[in-house]
C-alpha cells in the first residue's frame, strides 16, 4: 500500500500562460482524488501545445511521472482500432459488410448477454430514464454496424463486450490479425513508438517497462491492484502514453490514416439530443461545437479521457492509474460534458 503525499507533485513543463489554470486544475484534481500518476497532453492545430505530468509512476514514490510513463488506455483503444479497421477496409483487406457471426462464438456471446443482468445485454434504463435496448440476437449484424455500436438495434447502445468480438469476426472472415492491422494501418504511419497492442505484443518497445502500476484508494490509502490479464481487442488493451496517443490524433486529423472525407462525416453527421456513436467515437454537440470523444475505465485500476473539438482543432488526452478520470457515462447518451475534466477544458 502507498500513502498519497499531501502535496501535489507535478512534473509539468512550462505550460503556456493560457494553459496554466488548467495545469493547476489537474494538479489539484490529482491530489483531491488520490491519483498517484496522471498525464495529460493538449494538441492544437496539429501540434503538441502543452504537456503535464503529475505524481509518481511506481509504487515506491521514486520514479516521477514523465512523457515516457505509459498506462492501460482501456476503451480509448476503440477509436484507434476502428480507424485501423477503416483503413484496412479501404485497402481491400476486409469488408465492412462482413457478418459478426463470422466469429463462431458471437451467437453464444449474444445469447448469454441478452439473458444476463448486464444492462447493455438484457436492456433497462440509464440514470436519466433513457431506454437501453436489449441485444437483438436474431438481427443480422455487420462489422460496420458493430463499429457504430448497433448490436442492440437502430439506436446506439454502448456494448463493449460485443465490440470486443470484432477481431474474432475479422479473423473468422479470413482477415488479418487485429494487432497487425493496427500496427500497419495506424501505429507505424502515425510514428507511434513504445505502444504495446496488448500484453503479448512482440513490438511493444518500452511500453511495459514504463507502465504506471494501477492503484485504488481505500480508506485514505492507495492500494496497489493486480494488473488485468486481458490481451488486445478492438475494445481495449493498448498500453501507451498520452504523447503517443497524440501522434495518432495528429495523423488522424491530417488525413494520413483515413481520408478527410470520413472525418468530415463524423463532424457533420446529424445527431439527436442523446448524441451518437460512430466508428469508435462518441459524437456529442456542446454549445454549438461538435465533440468527438471516448472515455476509458479499468475498474479500480485506471481511467482515460480522449476529447476532440474539431471546430477548434483542439484535443485533450488524459490518462491516470486510478479510476478517478471516469464519470460513469450513460450507455445510450453521449455526455462528456458531465466529466469534470472535460467540462473544465471546454470552458477554458
Describe the predicted segments one by one.
Residues 1-6:
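Bacterial N-terminal signal peptides
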Residues 8-10:
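Cleavable N-terminal signal peptides
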Residues 12-53, 102, 176, 180-184, ...:
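Catalytic loop of the DD-peptidase/beta-lactamase superfamily, centered on the K-T-G motif
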Residues 19, 44, 56-177, 216-219:
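Active-site-proximal loop and beta-strand segments within enzyme catalytic domains
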Residues 89-90, 151, 170-174, 186-194, ...:
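Hydrophobic/aromatic-lined pockets within catalytic cores
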Residues 106-114, 186-197, 269-276:
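Short, mixed-charge aromatic SLiMs
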Residues 121-131, 202-228, 232-234, 282-284, ...:
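Carbohydrate-binding/catalytic loop surfaces
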Residues 142, 159-164, 174, 180, ...:
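Mid-domain, small-residue-enriched loop/turn segments at the edges of structured enzyme/sensor domains
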Amino acid at each position: 500500500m502507498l500513502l498519497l503525499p499531501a502535496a501535489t507533485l507535478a512534473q509539468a513543463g512550462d505550460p503556456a500562460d493560457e494553459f496554466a489554470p488548467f495545469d493547476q486544475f489537474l494538479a489539484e484534481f490529482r491530489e483531491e482524488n488520490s491519483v498517484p500518476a496522471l498525464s495529460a497532453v493538449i494538441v492544437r492545430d496539429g501540434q503538441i501545445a502543452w504537456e503535464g505530468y503529475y505524481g509518481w509512476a511506481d509504487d515506491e514514490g521514486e520514479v516521477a511521472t514523465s512523457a515516457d510513463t505509459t498506462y492501460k488506455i482501456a476503451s480509448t483503444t476503440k477509436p484507434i482500432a476502428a480507424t485501423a479497421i477503416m483503413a484496412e477496409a479501404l485497402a481491400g483487406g476486409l469488408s465492412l459488410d462482413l457478418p459478426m457471426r463470422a466469429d463462431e462464438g458471437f451467437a453464444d456471446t449474444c445469447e448469454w448477454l441478452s439473458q444476463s443482468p448486464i444492462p447493455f445485454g438484457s436492456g433497462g434504463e440509464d440514470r436519466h430514464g433513457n431506454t437501453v435496448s436489449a441485444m437483438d440476437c436474431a438481427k443480422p449484424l455487420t462489422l460496420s454496424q458493430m463499429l457504430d455500436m448497433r448490436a442492440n438495434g437502430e439506436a446506439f447502445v454502448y456494448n463493449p463486450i460485443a465490440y470486443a468480438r470484432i477481431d474474432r469476426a475479422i479473423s473468422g472472415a479470413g482477415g488479418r490479425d487485429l494487432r497487425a492491422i493496427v500496427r500497419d494501418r495506424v501505429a507505424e504511419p502515425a510514428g507511434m513508438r513504445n505502444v504495446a497492442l496488448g500484453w503479448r505484443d512482440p513490438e511493444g518497445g518500452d511500453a511495459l517497462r514504463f507502465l504506471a502500476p494501477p492503484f485504488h484508494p481505500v480508506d485514505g490509502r492507495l492500494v496497489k491492484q493486480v494488473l488485468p490479464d486481458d490481451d488486445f481487442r478492438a475494445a481495449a488493451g493498448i498500453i501507451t502514453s498520452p504523447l503517443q496517443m497524440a501522434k495518432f490524433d495528429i495523423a488522424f486529423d491530417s488525413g494520413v490514416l483515413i481520408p478527410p472525407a470520413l472525418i468530415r462525416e463524423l463532424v457533420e453527421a446529424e445527431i439527436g439530443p442523446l448524441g451518437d456513436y460512430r466508428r469508435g467515437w462518441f459524437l456529442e454537440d456542446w454549445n454549438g461545437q461538435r465533440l468527438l470523444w471516448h472515455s476509458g475505465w479499468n475498474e479500480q485500476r485506471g481511467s482515460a479521457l480522449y476529447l476532440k473539438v474539431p471546430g477548434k482543432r483542439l484535443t485533450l488526452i488524459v490518462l491516470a492509474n486510478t479510476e478517478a478520470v471516469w464519470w460513469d457515462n450513460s450507455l445510450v447518451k453521449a455526455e462528456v460534458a458531465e466529466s469534470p475534466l472535460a467540462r473544465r477544458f471546454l470552458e477554458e
